């Protein structure tokens, strides 16, 4: 990361496979995608796992699994190849192997550049409240959301020019992950530079970016900072 006078540059690993798949070493980042996170909560009835007949059950875990499959099917029908969505956190109660769950809660995170696309996704998410799932009710609650943050166009051009002058293969790319720079962008001109992540892996032990790729990122940032300093 580099802050000089009125600019901010942040170099970061891509955390995805796009650069590696394209055979490019540097990502000229133009924005951080808009995103939202909601919680879907399902309410059923706890009963004994061995004594309560299947047709009479109100299994909140099973209800949530039906809803999650519904979300995947309906959102995929929208046809946006660059849209991503994830369920990464779940809560189950009473979470005992001898009990049918009476409560299940899962997170739903979705990200895209266009707010109109996210509105379509959100409409599908909210529709879960209107349905009964395996005899259970569903409540949809907003956790947080953020709008797409675009980087300063002049700084982005400096990053691209720097990569070109250094003879480093590069491409424009969006950031699907949130970064410190997106908050700085509300206060001063900001941009980012991505370097390759091996196999696109991040937030896990195999996460790796080679010293060579990191050096390229630092070189591109240095030259971009010098361009901004001479502006």
Predicted regions and their residues:
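Conserved small/polar residues in nucleotide/adenosyl-binding loops
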Residues: 1-5
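Acidic-enriched catalytic cores of C-N bond-cleaving enzymes acting on peptides and small amides
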Residues: 6-9, 18-23, 30-31, 54-89, ...
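Short beta-strand segments
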Residues: 8-14, 41-43, 194-196
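Glycine-rich beta-alpha junction loops
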Residues: 13-17, 36, 46, 112
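Short beta-strand/turn micro-motifs at beta-sheet edges
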Residues: 26-30, 93-98
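Alpha-helical metal-binding/catalytic segments enriched in His/Glu/Asp
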Residues: 36-42, 51-75, 108, 184, ...
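A short beta-alpha structural unit
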Residues: 86-95, 107-113, 137-156, 176, ...
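Zn-dependent metallopeptidase/amidohydrolase metal-coordination segment
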Residues: 169-220, 225
């Amino acid at each position: 990361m580099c802050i000089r006078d009125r600019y901010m540059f942040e170099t970061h690993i891509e955390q995805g496979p796009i650069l590696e798949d394209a055979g490019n070493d540097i990502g000229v980042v133009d924005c951080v995608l808009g995103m939202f996170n909601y919680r879907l909560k399902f309410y059923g009835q706890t009963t004994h796992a061995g004594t309560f007949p299947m047709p009479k059950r109100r299994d909140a875990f099973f209800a949530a699994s039906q809803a999650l499959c519904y979300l995947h099917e309906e959102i995929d029908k929208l046809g946006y190849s660059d849209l991503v969505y994830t369920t990464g956190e779940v809560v189950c109660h009473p979470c005992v192997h001898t009990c049918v769950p009476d409560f299940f809660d899962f997170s739903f995170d979705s990200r895209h550049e266009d707010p109109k696309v996210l509105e379509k996704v959100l409409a599908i998410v909210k529709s879960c409240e209107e349905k009964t799932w395996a005899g259970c009710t569903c409540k949809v609650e907003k956790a947080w959301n953020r709008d797409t943050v675009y980087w300063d166009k002049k700084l982005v051009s400096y990053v691209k020019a720097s990569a070109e002058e250094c003879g480093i293969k590069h491409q424009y790319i969006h950031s699907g992950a949130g970064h410190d720079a997106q908050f700085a962008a509300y206060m001063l001109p900001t941009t980012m530079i991505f370097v390759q992540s091996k196999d696109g892996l991040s937030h896990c032990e195999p996460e790796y970016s080679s010293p060579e790729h990191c050096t390229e990122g630092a070189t591109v940032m240095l030259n971009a900072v010098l361009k901004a300093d001479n502006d």
